[in-house]
Amino acid sequence: DPPWDVLQYGSRGAVQHYGLLTPSQIRDLPLADLCAENAHCWLWVTNGTLRIGYDILESWGFTPRSIFTWVKPRVGLGTYLRNTTEHCLLGTRGKAPVRFKSQPSWGFFPVQPPHSHKPEEFYDIVERVSPGPYLELFARRPRHGWAAWGDEIASDVVIPGFPVPKYSDALIKDFHKKAEGA
């Protein structure tokens, strides 16, 4: 789940919880070097980053194949509409097989995890559909059988030039906006 620095200026948005990355910074992640030649990539996007997500997935060398929609039990934030969904794009590279082809393209999980955390059931879906090995970028907690990378967890991999910056463009703009009003 990339920390998108897109439309994050509200008092309850992602900028209040963690450092953010611009779409260019996310695109610059060396995902091609971290994945096998035959691989699946599941990329979480918000409603506001859906189009950008497709571009980034393709820039990493993956062909978009499907979209999984998480229907949330509570009404969330939104710039235009109050979002109750989040999406995960599924892309493939090479000839990675699909292990389970009857997976519905949506899920409703009755317990909504804390801000930006994804439901545990989603990891089960990934393991059912995609062959391993598994790597979660921007991970928050370890999962058995998965490698992890993120600034909130002991990472299994190193990505030169990263971790997530502590001060994103949105946070800096918000700081200046508040300073001008003071």
Predicted regions: what they are:
Residues 2-182:
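Class I S-adenosyl-L-methionine-dependent methyltransferase catalytic core
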